[in-house]
Amino acid sequence: MDRAAVARVGAVASASVCAVVAGVVLAQYIFTLKRKTGRKTKIIEMMPEFQKSSVRIKNPTRVEEIICGLIKGGAAKLQIITDFDMTLSRFSYNGKRCPTCHNIIDNCKLVTDECRRKLLQLKEQYYAIEVDPVLTVEEKFPYMVEWYTKSHGLLIEQGIPKAKLKEIVADSDVMLKEGYENFFGKLQQHGIPVFIFSAGIGDVLEEVIRQAGVYHSNVKVVSNFMDFDENGVLKGFKGELIHVFNKHDGALKNTDYFSQLKDNSNIILLGDSQGDLRMADGVANVEHILKIGYLNDRVDELLEKYMDSYDIVLVKEESLEVVNSILQKTL
């Protein structure tokens, strides 16, 4: 065989090998592509808000299924059940702690320095118990009652006038989370019921969202409301105490509200504590519930517990963009 013939045979053989290799590579690519596009976490992966390092999900498949259920149900089936302090409001801004509803009153100029010192001592004593990763909710329960009862007693002694609440809130450093206008606006636009369940001070909470322009008719607030005397001076608090770990009882007391929403069987629950997980206990017919938890403090100690109990955990996250992205697809 002459050299030209040998060269032709070699070229054909080489081409055949290349074709085989190319075919294998192409098959592998197609298989990989199909596997990627066929994964159940497709919706989550397509949402850029879920790609941030602050978003932690233990079971993406379960979250995907719940979100698909929410999307399928649409506006007709949806309701929102949410905490307020450090959930809808910010935990911090530019490295500085933002106030809770109680802190807004504690820090106002109508409270004496002596009272403020005592309130701070109570916070230092009991907050450590509230976020202790070892103690059970049942063990924390009586300490929370002590804390709230003592704090409310001190505030009553100050004789806070109702007429000053608007000014007190306006002068405070309270801030709602980034994206709050979109959150409240879209929910109002579609008539979605919003149940704000707070262990804070209801009068202050309502004034915060009123001044932010988002206290719409679809929003219901359940909280610790002040009781004023005939002169408009604080004399006590109405009803039974709501604290961070008895929201289960409060939820059951609001079954009349939830029974009116029997068709709203899909729930997005927002909270920042283990106690907030019980806020939907008064809902009888739950089809899909997505629990989103903000982990603001002691992340290393509490992350595992939050990952076990919340579907989505948002670590040191000061925005509502994750829930807003879900609402965008659902409504």
Swiss-Prot record:
Q: Which UniProt keywords apply?
A: Cytoplasm, Hydrolase, Magnesium, Metal-binding, Nucleotide metabolism, Nucleotide-binding, Phosphoprotein, Transferase
Q: Which GO terms describe its biological process?
A: adenosine metabolic process; CMP catabolic process; dCMP catabolic process; dTMP catabolic process; dUMP catabolic process; UMP catabolic process
* Superkingdom assignment: Eukaryota
Molecular function, one GO term: transferase activity
Any idea which positions bind CMP?
E130
Q: Which Gene3D superfamilies match?
A: HAD superfamily/HAD-like, Pyrimidine 5'-nucleotidase (UMPH-1), N-terminal domain
Q: Binding of substrate: at which residues?
A: S198, A199, G200, K247
Query: According to the UniProt entry, which residues carry Phosphoserine?
Result: S273
One GO cellular component assignment for this chain's record is: nuclear body
Catalysed reactions, as listed in the record: N(7)-methyl-GMP + H2O = N(7)-methylguanosine + phosphate; a ribonucleoside 5'-phosphate + H2O = a ribonucleoside + phosphate
**Which CDD domains does this one have?**
HAD_5NT (cd07504)
Where does it live in the cell? Cytoplasm
Catalytic residues identified in the record: D83 (nucleophile), D85 (proton donor)
Expression across tissues: Isoform 2 is highly expressed in the brain, heart, spleen, kidney and blood. Isoform 2 is expressed (at protein level) in the spleen, skeletal muscle and gastrointestinal epithelia.
Binding residues annotated for Mg(2+), in chain numbering: D83, D85, D272
Its chief place of residence is cytoplasm
Stated EC number for the protein is: 3.1.3.5, 3.1.3.91
Residues that bind N(7)-methyl-GMP: E130, S151
User: NCBIfam families in the record, alphabetically?
Assistant: HAD-SF-IB (TIGR01488), HAD-SF-IE (TIGR01544)
Q: How does it assemble?
A: Monomer.
Q: What protein family is recorded? A: Belongs to the pyrimidine 5'-nucleotidase family.
Q: Which PANTHER family match?
A: 5'-NUCLEOTIDASE, CYTOSOLIC 5'-NUCLEOTIDASE 3A
Q: What does this protein do?
A: Nucleotidase which shows specific activity towards cytidine monophosphate (CMP) and 7-methylguanosine monophosphate (m(7)GMP). CMP seems to be the preferred substrate.
Protein name (database record) = Cytosolic 5'-nucleotidase 3A
Say which species the protein is native to. Answer: Mus musculus (Mouse)
